[in-house]
Amino acid sequence: GYLHRGDEKIAENMTYNQFVPYTDRLDYLAPLANNMAYAIAVERLAKLEVPARCQAIRVLTAEMARISAHLMGLGAFGLDVGAWTVLLYSLEEREKLYKLFEELTGARFTTSYTRIGGVTRDVPEGWLGRVGAFCDQFLPILEEILKLLTRNKIFMDRTVGVGVISRADALAYGLTGPNLRGSGVGLDLRKDKPYSGYEQYEFDVPVGTTGDCYDRYLVRGEEMRQSVRIIRQVLARFPDGPWYAPDARRIFAPPKDKVMTSMEELIQNFMIVTEGPQIPPGEVYFEAENPKGVLGFFIVSRGGGVPYRLKIRSPSFCNLSILPKACQGILISDVVALLGSMDFVMGECDR
C-alpha cells in the first residue's frame, strides 16, 4: 500500500488523454506496453480503428519494453540470490534500449508515447535500422547472460524445486504472464486473443513443467528470445501509411501549424484540450499481455471526455496473492528467491 496513488479515482477526474501519463506509472519498467493497453481499450470504446503502421509501431515498442522489463527482472533476481554480475550485464543492455526509447519518444523512462487513435509521432529516420542492429548484437549477449545462471550450481540449488506453484493453484489464484506459464499453462493473449496485429507474427509461447523458481527464470529468458523474433518480423514487413487513425479528429489535437493558421483547427484544439475526446456512452474491458502478465482496463463511459469509471486489473496484484500459499513449508531464505522469481512491480500492484 505504500505506492497507492488512487489511479482509478484520478481517472474519473481527468480526460481520456490526460490519463495516459498515469498508465506509464503502473508497471513503470514497461510504460510503452501500459500505454498501448489503455489506448486500445479507449479505442474499442470509441469504435476507432488504427492503421497498420500504428499497430506495427505499438507491437515493436511493446516487445522492446518486454525485453527491457525482463532484463531488469532477471538482473534483480540474480542479485537477490547473490549473482551480482548478471545485474551489471542486464543494465548495460537495458541502457541501449533506453537510448532507443529516448530517440523515439523524447523520454527514457515514463514515455507517454502512445495516444488514443495512434502514437505521438512517427519513427525517426534510421531508427528502425538501429533497432535491428540492437537485436543482432543483443542475442549473443543474452546467451552469455543466461549462461551465468542456467547451469550455475549455486543458482540451481537456490531455485530448482523452490517456490513450486502447481498448475491448479496458478489458475485458482489468477496468475498470468511468465508466472502462469512457468506452471505449465500456455496462456498468452498475444496468441489466444491477438490484438494490434499480433496474429500475423510467428513466435512460440514458452512454458515450464514444475512451476518452481527455476522454471519461471527459464520462461523469461526464452520470452526475450521470442520478443527479438517478433521485432525482426515487424521490421521486415513494416508498413507504410499514417501513424494515427485518419478518422480520429474528435480525439487527436490538430497539428500546431494548422492551429496557428486556421480558426476551425484552433477551435478543435481548444475543445480537445479543455473537454477531452468525446467518447460515446458504453463500457469496455480490454486486456493485453504485458511483461508482468495480463493488464486489463475496464472503462465505463456516460459520454463526453471523462470516464465515469475506470478499473485496472493489475497482474502483479494477482500474482502476489498466491505468496501466502507458496511460502508454506519453505525456508525463510527461500522466500527471497520466490519473490525474485515472481518479478512484480509494486507501483502496478498498489496503483
Regions found by a protein language model. Give the residues of each.
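Metal/cofactor-centered catalytic core regions of large enzymes
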Residues: 1-351
